[in-house]
Amino acid sequence: MMIARMETSATAAAATSAPRLRLAKRSLFDPMIVRSALPQSLRKLAPRVQARNPVMLVVLVGAVITTLAFLRDLASSTAQENVFNGLVAAFLWFTVLFANFAEAMAEGRGKAQAAALRKVRSETMANRRTAAGNIESVPSSRLDLDDVVEVSAGETIPSDGEIIEGIASVDESAITGESAPVIRESGGDRSAVTGGTVVLSDRIVVRITAKQGQTFIDRMIALVEGAARQQTPNEIALNILLAGLTIIFLLAVVTLQPFAIYSGGGQRVVVLVALLVCLIPTTIGALLSAIGIAGMDRLVQHNVLATSGRAVEAAGDVNTLLLDKTGTITLGNRQATEFVPINGVSAEAVADAAQLSSLADETPEGRSIVVLAKDEFGLRARDEGVMSHARFVPFTAETRMSGVDLAEVSGIRRIRKGAAAAVMKWVRDHGGHPTEEVGAIVDGISSGGGTPLVVAEWTDNSSARAIGVVHLKDIVKVGIRERFDEMRRMSIRTVMITGDNPATAKAIAQEAGVDDFLAEATPEDKLALIKREQQGGRLVAMTGDGTNDAPALAQADVGVAMNTGTQAAREAGNMVDLDSDPTKLIEVVEIGKQLLITRGALTTFSIANDVAKYFAIIPAMFVGLYPVLDKLNVMALHSPRSAILSAVIFNALVIVALIPLALRGVRFRAESASAMLRRNLLIYGLGGLVVPFIGIKLVDLVIVALGVS
């Protein structure tokens, strides 16, 4: 009743208060971000910034050289030559600036999110509890690790912490953007609270778990702003490839001049620099950083924060998904629907024992048992706090049981309720022998996709015995089978993790369409499965929210922790889902794959379009010496100068044209790697060959029409 009353009041409170902030989707060219990116493009011309990108550093050096050559020859050259030299130098500068603009646009989206988050991180007064039990009001900036604070309805939680006392409805819209309030309470996996969120009802006592400057919001700001961004292994490898190609083309251009001089047609520095810049992979070199930053930003748009680009890349390479059954594959509101007694025991007796054993069970299933016993048999829920003769045994993932030890006149009566295998073992360990009838009931419920919880008791004067079974029902989510079919087409193996017995797990696994399942799983089993998969050369992704999930989250290549989870879980994972939706793991993998596909597609396009620029510049450079080279002028460009200038201008403009694709990402489809490769080679490989021929010709026509050439 208390929970129902609190949820009602929370809903009413939420109705009157709109969310203050959400990690909202922004348009691709948000005017505010564009205005911020323009000056950043100029600041990024600093050599120390350009040094991180070897390709663009070469372009920058080329722009400086051509500018100096233009200024040197300004007085001695003809007007036409000066226009040519000036335009080449200008568009080399534009090439660098466009690359800087792409990176600044990607960074700007994160900085806009960070600016909004800083509004949440405001100084508040906290009611700190002293060692003597008194309350003192202190600024939130003075709170230390393990301080204890009291937060009442209407007050802002001053810092990250764990609830150690009480239950409350909390408005987390400042973090998640979700206006509906959530329940936070002491104990279990819903005890973590975040600084900057607001208590809507009741009162809680919170133990501070974060040092100043290391709160969840501080880490969010650092992540979305890119302060913690480092190059990923794939980016480093691609940079090495691009640097190698740049060196090869640099050597080719340097050695070309002696041959040209020997042939009697030495080339000017401006022409040689133009050739070099057009041949090196400037397109992907200009967009590489933006692609990586935009990939992390797409996660932010889905309310997922990654600790690094490495985590996003790993998501794209994942080939095993570990998915918890409850809440991910099924709706997660598994409810008790029936008490099934064995012969000689009444259903009411089973309900009474099941309810007693569930009083300390804070899981949704445990609470549903208490409610069902009350509804079916009028058994009033007893408050564990006033049962002085009882010692409650809480549910844990390790024991997979909960229960109570009652001090009665005849002795100690011990009641246990939980997973069939765990309770059966408990019965055998205490002298009992589970009957075939219990096994038949368990198998019948399991084969129908339900979850059986066995109820057993043991008194001092007799052996332990099973007295009945609680039938829990859950529903597989609509459309989840189709999502798993998509994963299978991408050669991703799906494994369902559940605490259910093998029969129940098998029935649900078949209905959902997963490739495999792990039944009666403990945290140790989950960790062992991850290690086995990794030893086989597979990358593993999983979700978790509890402290017992922390080792597995840390071991997994992609560990997505729920924002509603414990502090330990959030620190162990390399991603945090602000919506606490386990199903989102599938979307995380798709975003990771989209990042890798985008990078590969634009790399293919960048290298392929060098062919057209080769056909434009090489004939133009030497057609005077070797007229036969005019046959290579397949685009029928107007003159050698217009050919070189057209290639340089196109080389700069194509970067601008591809910025939306770099930020938005290549369209993702669930298909096999070979099909994906064929499609991208056709679109971006063939496109990289054809588009430059058309683009350079169009630029040439414009140059001629303007009388520049």
Swiss-Prot record:
Task: Please list the GO biological process terms of this entry.
Answer: potassium ion transmembrane transport
Major localization listed first in the record, in broad terms:
membrane
Catalytic activity, per the record?
Answer: K(+)(out) + ATP + H2O = K(+)(in) + ADP + phosphate + H(+)
GO CC annotation:
plasma membrane; potassium ion-transporting ATPase complex; potassium:proton antiporter complex
Which positions are annotated as binding Mg(2+)? D545, D549
Which superkingdom does the taxonomy of this entry point to? Bacteria
Question: What GO molecular functions are on record for this protein?
Answer: ATP binding; ATP hydrolysis activity; magnesium ion binding; P-type potassium transmembrane transporter activity
Give the keywords, sorted: ATP-binding, Cell membrane, Ion transport, Magnesium, Membrane, Metal-binding, Nucleotide-binding, Phosphoprotein, Potassium, Potassium transport, Translocase, Transmembrane, Transmembrane helix, Transport
* Transmembrane spans: 55-75, 86-106, 236-256, 269-289, 615-635, 643-663, 688-708
Location(s) in or outside the cell: Cell membrane
| Binding site residues for ATP | D361, E365, F395, T396, A397, E398, T399, R400, M401, S402, K417
Q: How does it sit in the membrane?
A: Multi-pass membrane protein
Q: Which cysteines are joined by disulfide bonds?
A: none
Pfam families in alphabetical order: E1-E2_ATPase, Hydrolase
Q: What does this protein do?
A: Part of the high-affinity ATP-driven potassium transport (or Kdp) system, which catalyzes the hydrolysis of ATP coupled with the electrogenic transport of potassium into the cytoplasm. This subunit is responsible for energy coupling to the transport system and for the release of the potassium ions to the cytoplasm.
| HAMAP family (alphabetical) | KdpB
Q: Which PANTHER family match?
A: POTASSIUM-TRANSPORTING ATPASE ATP-BINDING SUBUNIT (PTHR43743:SF1)
Family membership: Belongs to the cation transport ATPase (P-type) (TC 3.A.3) family. Type IA subfamily.
Q: What quaternary structure, including any partners, is listed in this protein's UniProt entry?
A: The system is composed of three essential subunits: KdpA, KdpB and KdpC.
State the protein's name: Potassium-transporting ATPase ATP-binding subunit
